Amino acid sequence: MSLMKVSLLLGMASIGLTIAVVFLCYSLYTYTCETNDASSYNKTTSSTTFSPLMSSTLPASEAPWEKDFRLSPDIIPKLYEVKLHPDLITGLFTCEEKISVRVLSRVNYIYLHIDRLNVTKSVVTQNGVNIPVKSAFSYPKNQYWVITLEKSLEVGECTLEFLADGNLRKQDIVGFYESRYKAANNETRLIATSKFEPTYARQAFPCFDEPSMKAKFLVKLVKPKDKYIALSNMNVKNSIEDSPGPNQTTVEFEVSVPMSTYLVCFIVCDFNALPSVKSTQGFPVNVYAREGQLENMKYAQDIAVKSINFYVEYFGINYPLPKLDLIAIPDFVSGAMEHWGLVTFREASVLYKKGSSSVVNMKRVAMTTSHELAHMWFGDLVTMGWWNDLWLNEGFASYMQYKSLAKVEPSWEVDTMFLTDMLHSTLQLDQTLSSHPIVQTVSNPDQITEIFDVISYQKGSSVIRMLENMMGADNFSKGVNSYLQEFQFKNAETNHLWAHLQRFAGNMSVTQVMDTYTRQMGFPLITVKKNGDQITFTQQRYLANSKANYDPNDSPFKYTWHVYITMTTSDAPNQTLSTWLYRNASEASISVPAKTTWVKVNRHQVGYFRVNYEPDMWKALIDQLITDHTVLDPRDRSNLLDDAFNLAESEHIGYNTTFSLMKYLSKEDHFVPWTDVYNKLARLEDKLYGTDGHANFQKYVRSLLRDKITTDTWVVENKDFLEVNVKIVLNDLGCNFGVKTCLSKAEELLRKWFKTGEKPDADLRGVVYRYGMENVGKEEWDQMWTKFKEEANPQEQLKMLGGLGSVKDIEQLEKFLEMAKDEKNIRSQDYFTVIIIVANNPIGLPVAWKYLQNNWDNLVKRFGLNHRVFGRIIPSVCSKFKTEDKLKEVEDFFAKHPNAGAGAAGRKQALETIQNNIKWVNKHAKPLAEWLEQNVSEEDV
């Protein structure tokens, strides 16, 4: 599944508030789930008479379904035969199901998963004989359907049959749910679709809903006879018209390969498809979308074909299904989902129209598509055995999307983008005490939902990138191929991957090295010193708060790491020197020529660590950048900026070093270093906002841009990907920090659109809407709202939301949040985007916080505490607080609402961030204000 960062907040997960906020949905949008109300789901009947609340023959204290969240290993599913009939008029669905299972030991009970289903029939058959059911009932605490039997099952084959019904979900858009859209004639059209990862298949049909319980699926879907189609993971086998009734058609699909329940997909819709395109392997790649959007699927189809061809060649294993479908869903809780053979997307993640979509949108479509197709192997073909190894799915897919696009879109320099897309944001989280290891124990749905986060996706991909660099690309590829070959159609654990990579890793112990990065949180700070011809390296744990207390014994490795150190030097800037700093060693060293003037450690930032240098070594690097920055690769320039800002924040170096480093930026033309600078300057401004140094800080940033922003910056007719991206970043940065020519241009283009209907260039719209709307009145706000309601392009709508939430009118922002409650105004999938947009507006931050406090109970009722984005809304809103009063408010709020659900980790992160902000303001705000007063020129831009 594509998390595309809640840094991911945005498709351009990196570029400031404007572009960043617009794509919030790309990150950490996922699913919603609420715990069952037992009273609602105990209405059951069976072919055998029993009391629905009858207890098991076992004492309650010994009942396995009561004491264990995990399923029993005694019953293994082999084949599901599932027939679902969604009624798009009533919003209900029925389920007829038969499960063939293997019984591995004699038991007189069976339990499997259900949630929000009403089971009306439970039949157990073995060797052609019905086994009398003693009782059948729901156990909501663990989301089980329990069947106790009059006699024990024998070892061997067994069949379970169920009838059930449920509601097509409308608000949480997980499980089997209803999605709506407006047709060209303004008619509301309905479709039924599904999203089962991680624990929502049980909301559609009784099942053994754990990833290790792989089985084959024979799916039948009932659809309206005319106009509608039915889609599932496999291709259609046959269709029976007027079945089960008039004007209905039952569509039967071929039996699937073995797969986990969360990968199954059911869709009944009235969409159309573009002509199929064949892969080099020969299977068709199809794309589907609603009326008016189908042509905008062409780019995704093209990327899909090229990506799938790359993966077949790279992995050395053919795609195992007879077809591959991609479909754009109007209401979708995450960026996309890798259902095997039927990949579902949020529309904003997959639609691209040349000439009216931006390069940011294009990148998002390409990244999301490549990510999901990597899952066809990592996740679908080979699946983690349990959710504690989720990173095997998501970390690998997140890295492979970059390898694929390096081949598909070579001019994009995707490995350079990896730094600001993935690496820097995960370092930001992982340098806190509230982080967690990549591999961690999870047991219940809230914990499972919670680990679909930056650590699983972005840290996972970052350490894989590091490991490939350690091993070499060819050896890494061979190890991956070996792993996939052995575990295809099976489940695997982290140690299995290490074992296969070890075969091609030479003398390096993959397990010993990588366990220090996957089984403990955090990362090292490498301190570099020069003594004659020796460059020495030492390590310590890096924390954003360098004075924080922690117990090294909390980690099995005592927060030390095996570090593969690479570096380049002034004498040979295109060559790489390397050594190992082992976790129990006091130091390591590399010899260099005595004439060496500078060294840059962690070449291309492939290592997962930060680097600090002695003052003279920092000065030598800064001098080189000012003299000729191109001697260092853009990845190294971005790395230096990222480390320098963070090291100053954690008090390892002074801000004078960081500000000196930025002097070279007048010569910088690559968008990745500028993207990193924007992110860091915006974070620094958040801390300075409301302090004496804020105005001078804005003036300082404007001085950095004096030679960078010209009239040409607003001309994006040349669609060179890298050039357009740097213009987007510079325009956004200039507007954000008050460059007058930027703000006036944004307002000019906005008013021109309002007056003449001529839209700004697609690549400028995010900036124009965001900053052009800052100072408008109610009339212009209403005008933008009308345009938002009339707009059919979901990507364009997201940009408009960014403008609607940017006004400096508190009353209007309050009204906006109230309007967003109504799903007729804002789709449920975009609701939290609106809140975060308002919170990212300095005027709107207290408005959004007050809104959350006043509406919390209603939000819990609407979304449930298992909703991942809801779980992260608190740190998203509160991360800019920096006073003791606000800290107390947040603590009191948590005390008033102690049940965090999937937001428990987010709450810890919020508190730690606020505490660190308070510490920073107390330590740095005054001296930084004094430095700015002395060093900022009177001349302004």
Regions found by a protein language model. Give the residues of each.
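Hydrophobic helix-coil surface modules that form long, contiguous segments used
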Residues: 95, 194-199, 206-370, 399, ...
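Beta-strand-rich binding/interaction modules
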Residues: 118-125, 507-511, 516, 523-602
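Long, ordered, helix-rich scaffold segments
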Residues: 416, 423-425, 431, 531-538, ...
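N-terminal, polar/Ser/Thr-rich
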Residues: 2-94, 128, 183-191, 209-211, ...
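Ligand-binding face of N-terminal immunoglobulin V-set domains in extracellular IgSF glycoproteins
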Residues: 94-115
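Hydrophobic alpha-helical and helix-loop surface patches within well-folded domains
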Residues: 253, 284-548, 683, 690-710, ...
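A surface-exposed beta-strand-loop module
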Residues: 117-182, 245, 587-593
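Glycine/proline-rich low-complexity spacer/linker segments in large multi-domain proteins
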Residues: 68-72, 154, 163-218, 269-277, ...
